[in-house]
Amino acid sequence: MEKLDKRREEETYLWIPVQFLDQALIAVLKCIGLLCQPAKKTAPSPVTFNQPEEQEEDYGVALKDDDVVVLLRDNKAKSKKRDKEKPSSGRPGQTNSVPNAAIQVYKED
C-alpha cells in the first residue's frame, strides 16, 4: 500500500513539468487558431407553457431574398470639442511677470 502511494506521488511529481508544457502549448495553439476543441453539447432546457416566447431583437440586420442587408443607425454620442490649452509664456518654476510696455499702457488710460 505504501509503495503504491509513493509511486503515485512520484508520477505526479514527474508530470508537473510536462503538464505545464502541455497547458502552454494548448494556450498558444488556441491563440493562433489552430486548436478548435469540439463544442460540448448540452441538453435543451425544458420549456414550460407559462414561459413567454423570446423575442428577437433587431440589431440593424435585414434579410431580403437570401441576401443580408446591414442597416446602420447613428446612435453614437458626439463629444464636445475643446479649445487647446495655451501654454504659459513663462519658464517652468518661475512666476510670470508683466512686461514694462504693458504697465505703461494701463497707466495712460
UniProtKB/Swiss-Prot annotation:
Origin organism lineage: Eukaryota, Viridiplantae, Streptophyta, Embryophyta, Tracheophyta
Q: Which residues form the signal peptide?
A: none
The annotated region (Disordered) lies at 74-109
Propeptide-annotated positions?
Answer: 1-73
The protein's name is Elicitor peptide 2
- Write out the function statement from the record: Elicitor of plant defense.
Q: Where is this site: Required for ligand-receptor interaction?
A: 90
Tell me which Pfam families the record gives: Pep1_7
InterPro entries linked to this entry: PEP
Coiled-coil regions, chain positions: none
Family (UniProt):
Belongs to the brassicaceae elicitor peptide family.
Keyword presence, Ubl conjugation: no
Write the gene name.
PEP2
Organism domain of life: Eukaryota
Compositional bias of kind Basic and acidic residues: 74-88
Sorted alphabetically, which keywords does the UniProt record give? Answer: Plant defense
One Gene Ontology term of the biological-process aspect is: innate immune response
